[in-house]
Amino acid sequence: MRPSKRRPDQLRSVQITRHYTRHAEGSVLIECGDTRIICTASVDEKVPLFLRGKGQGWLTAEYGMLPRSTNERMQREAAKGKQSGRTMEIQRLIGRALRSVMDLTKLGERTIQVDCDVIQADGGTRTASITGAFVAVHDAIGTLLRKQAIEATPITGHVAAVSVGVYEGVPMLDLDYLEDSRCDTDMNIVMTDDLGLVEMQGTAEGMPFSRNDLDMMLDLAQQGIRELIAAQKNALNR
């Protein structure tokens, strides 16, 4: 039995609230169980130097955690004067995931800046950030379309992410913090709505996992991502 009492193939409850903040072109609060993240997408009318004059846009992401988003207060990274390797890894993952469903040539020479700020953490913050940020980006693109700043949407499909793992020998979907801290294997999967794999990050924390375990985890992730994309579509239709 999982500590959360969920079935091995059961997601935590998911709630996506759009237009959560006033100023950003796209903003979302995503709640996955007790994990809560504010995702915003802002439009910047310029591109990085390496893209100037090339007629295409860019999307990049930043990620951070509030000091008391966890059980014990963390020092702000700004106070330390540098980002941790974990933070840099996660924000690059978010950017790659979102760019996988963008035709940046349709964006023009502008940048979508995504910010994912964890206000409460209970596992799965990087995967929830991707799932929520997609909706924020969708709304930011909607703003550009309404302003006639672009002629067509650059979004080519949906993308979402979920964690899977092996806990006490059983492959499981959507690990919370307690499960993640005790699992034998931890893996993050990013997929599109046509079930294309964007990224897999997996590590055996204790015993190595088998090919059969991997196949079972991929099946669980595919099921979970279908449900998460359905939640995205439901939020966008409200």
From Swiss-Prot:
It is an enzyme of class 2 (transferase). It catalyses: tRNA(n+1) + phosphate = tRNA(n) + a ribonucleoside 5'-diphosphate. The keyword Cell membrane does not apply. GO terms for molecular function: 3'-5'-RNA exonuclease activity; tRNA binding; tRNA nucleotidyltransferase activity. It comes from the Bacteria. One of its GO terms (biological process) is rRNA processing. Phosphate binds at R86, G124, T125, R126. Its EC number is 2.7.7.56. InterPro entries: ExoRNase_PH_dom1 (IPR001247), ExoRNase_PH_dom2 (IPR015847), ExoRNase_PH_dom2_sf (IPR036345), PNPase/RNase_PH_dom_sf (IPR027408), Ribosomal_Su5_D2-typ_SF (IPR020568), RNase_PH (IPR050080), RNase_PH_bac-type (IPR002381), RNase_PH_CS (IPR018336). Coiled coil: none annotated. Belongs to the RNase PH family. NCBIfam families: RNasePH. HAMAP family: RNase_PH (MF_00564). Phosphorolytic 3'-5' exoribonuclease that plays an important role in tRNA 3'-end maturation. Removes nucleotide residues following the 3'-CCA terminus of tRNAs; can also add nucleotides to the ends of RNA molecules by using nucleoside diphosphates as substrates, but this may not be physiologically important. Probably plays a role in initiation of 16S rRNA degradation (leading to ribosome degradation) during starvation. This is Ribonuclease PH. It comes from Nitrosospira multiformis (strain ATCC 25196 / NCIMB 11849 / C 71). The lineage of its organism: Bacteria, Pseudomonadati, Pseudomonadota, Betaproteobacteria, Nitrosomonadales.
